[in-house]
Swiss-Prot record:
InterPro entries according to UniProt: Epimerase_deHydtase (IPR001509), NAD(P)-bd_dom_sf (IPR036291), NAD(P)_dehydrat-like (IPR050425)
Organism: Arabidopsis thaliana
UniProt entry tagged with the keyword Protein biosynthesis: no
Stated name of the protein: Protein BRI1-5 ENHANCED 1
Gene of this entry: BEN1
Superkingdom field: Eukaryota
Length: 364
């Protein structure tokens, strides 16, 4: 069997990720749980992470069913950046589904061997109540999980979690240490923290959803994998500016509002996120939480890095000490790396890829 994979070309990024294609001979473990068919489902297909994952899955040889929701007027979004991807005409199907109507995901899931649940029903800075957001998030998740069981073909379920589920853990590394998958945020620690950069609704809903997914998998014999990710940065094929890219480049955008500044920036390249998901899909055994974070930089290091590597933006000299920033701890990806995964991108690729995409779309 031959599979075709596209490597990112950091010198010539385009709307489809850029780069030259090379043929790879699939090893015997690819894909172990997908021997009969390479059909997978990706929810929230129009988003930053999901769209890049879809691109990589198609390049890897999988057939993909992507779900998207309609806009506020009930019309489908412009998803030409998905439908025009290489191999999309042969192996990509688009389904309309909404987390407010969990049963709407059933047609997309039927017959799939794996489901990547990337969709989340809110923005991290939303002002909706915790109860409203958490109820909608968990109900949507549970509906999708039940559809996975009903399909009788889904072997592995992936939930895209967030580093907010481990950042606010008080004594368990809350003093600026490093945390791993054994740590869970304490909601009260988060609420008592003076400087916050996300809403309590986002923190509580992500924790509730990840916990519910893991518990559901344990009770029903479904392999559940959760990928705990920090700021995801790098190039993007989606049409809008991803919020995580904007936050990471806030200084270049001339935005020094404190809500966009952190004591420590934990980041990972978008392609490493997609690669990690596919890696865990293709492993014969994968279960539970995996932190996926590769770069950790202090705020002054980010400022110095951007000023030095990208002098054309002429960042102003400022006293960063005057800003009240949220303090965050380090993240350990030891479990993921011990499983055999290798991160491919560092800080320079993370920032340069994001900047090129922003420039190509007129955001910078």
């Amino acid at each position: 069997m031959v599979r075709e994979e596209q490597e990112e070309d950091d010198n010539n990024n385009n709307n489809n990720g850029g780069g030259e294609r090379k043929l790879l001979v699939a090893d015997e473990t690819v894909p172990s749980l997908l021997d009969e068919t390479g059909l997978v489902c990706v929810t929230g297909g129009s988003g930053f992470v999901a769209s890049w994952l879809i691109m990589r899955l198609l390049q890897r040889g999988y057939s993909v069913r992507a779900t998207v929701r309609t806009n506020s007027e009930g019309n489908k979004k412009d998803i030409s950046y998905l439908t025009e991807l290489p191999f999309a005409s042969e192996r990509l199907q688009i389904f309309t589904a909404d987390l407010n109507e969990p049963e709407s995901f059933k047609p997309a899931i039927e017959g799939c061997k794996a489901v990547f649940h990337v969709a989340h029903p809110m923005d991290p800075n939303s002002n909706e109540t915790e109860e409203t957001v958490t109820k909608r998030t968990v109900q949507g998740l549970m509906g999708i999980l039940k559809s996975c069981l009903d399909a009788k073909t889904v072997k592995r379920f992936f939930y895209t979690s967030s580093a907010v589920t481990v950042f606010y853990s008080g004594g368990n590394g809350g003093g600026g240490g490093e945390v791993d998958e054994s740590v869970w945020s304490d909601v009260e620690v988060f609420r008592n923290q003076k400087e916050k950069r996300v809403s309590s609704s986002y923190v509580v809903s992500k924790m509730a959803a990840e916990t519910a997914a893991l518990e559901f998998g344990g009770k029903n014999g479904l392999e559940v994998v959760t990928l705990v990710i920090p700021l995801v940065v790098g190039p993007f094929i989606s049409s809008s500016l991803p919020s995580s890219v904007f936050i990471s480049l806030a200084m270049l955008f001339g935005n020094y509002k404190e809500k966009y500044l952190f004591d420590t920036y934990n980041m990972v390249h978008i392609d490493d996120v997609a690669r990690a998901m596919i890696f865990l899909l293709e492993k014969p055994v994968a279960k539970g939480r995996y932190i996926c974070s590769s770069v950790e930089m202090k705020i002054d290091e980010v400022f110095e890095f951007l000023s030095t590597k990208f002098p054309q933006f002429q960042l102003p000299s400022i006293d960063l000490n005057k800003y009240k920033v949220e303090k965050r701890m380090g993240l350990s990806s030891k479990k993921l790396k011990s499983a055999g995964f290798e991160f491919k991108y560092g800080a320079e690729e993370i920032f340069s890829g994001a900047i090129r995409s922003c420039q190509a779309r007129g955001f910078l």
